[in-house]
Amino acid sequence: LKRFAPSLLMLLAGLNATAADQVLRHDWKRHFAAYGVEGTFVLFDPEANSYGVHNVVRVRHGYLPASTFKIPNALIGLEVGSIRDEREVFRWDGHPKPRAALERDHTLDSGMKDSVAWMFQEVAHRTGKARMKEWLAQFEYGNQSIEGGIEHFWLQGGLRVSAMEQMEFLRKLEEGRLPVSARSRRLVRDALRIEETAGGLTLYAKTGTTGAVREPVAWWVGWVERRGVPVAYFAMNVTPTKAEPLGAREAITRAILAQEIGYGL
């Protein structure tokens, strides 16, 4: 695993990244510039116990999590029974949806991979406000706000989470530091698995994109493993533009992962 090549080694106050080196990565700026987007990227190297950060101000700024909230939503749902298991089928109501992939029945795995909003709104509805608020506090997830309604608070309501908080949440999930069962953790991990490279690296990740809100954002958060051992955790977001609405987040992430851990090379 490559070590972060520091442009500037510094302590980034308030990032909840104590006892770890934190490096401001000016060289990552070129990846964002290539797509003409503003954004942030944080990558944690568990072997070196160090963080690389592009845009130290934005990495602490809270945004709507959008569909990345499917991760805590699913964990909570499994814990409280809003999702019975990986085989439970959530039935499409037959009404037209924005994408064809949404117009069918779904399970936990397909609902996560196809980012099925209506399914996870049903999960949140089953969980209810009181239990949702309690679990967000236990997870220390963002500002823990559920203002805006139980089916909308992560899409256009009051919930806000920063890229650093997203990355730390994924670390807690993978390291077994969230108050959830091994079963819930395993099922959500399985649903987040995206691909495995020829080099033996496995990517677990989730996208998220807001609609028409005051601060639109596109997310990609996740981690990479080599033979079951995490080698990098990451969280990034960009402000979508008309010229490059969504593709930038994946391209930038893959470029940085290739640079830092040889992902996809």
Language-model-detected regions and their locations in the chain:
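Sec-dependent signal peptide recognition
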Residues: 2-8
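Hydrophobic h-region of N-terminal signal peptides that target proteins for export
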Residues: 10-18
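Structured C-terminal helix/loop/strand segments within mature extracytoplasmic catalytic/sensor domains
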Residues: 20-31, 35, 62, 125-130, ...
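Short, well-structured active-site flanking segments
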Residues: 24, 79-95, 180-185
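Flexible glycine/proline-enriched surface loops and loop-helix/loop-strand junctions
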Residues: 55-60, 104-105, 113-120, 147-154, ...
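Mid-domain, small-residue-enriched loop/turn segments at the edges of structured enzyme/sensor domains
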Residues: 100, 104-108, 120-175
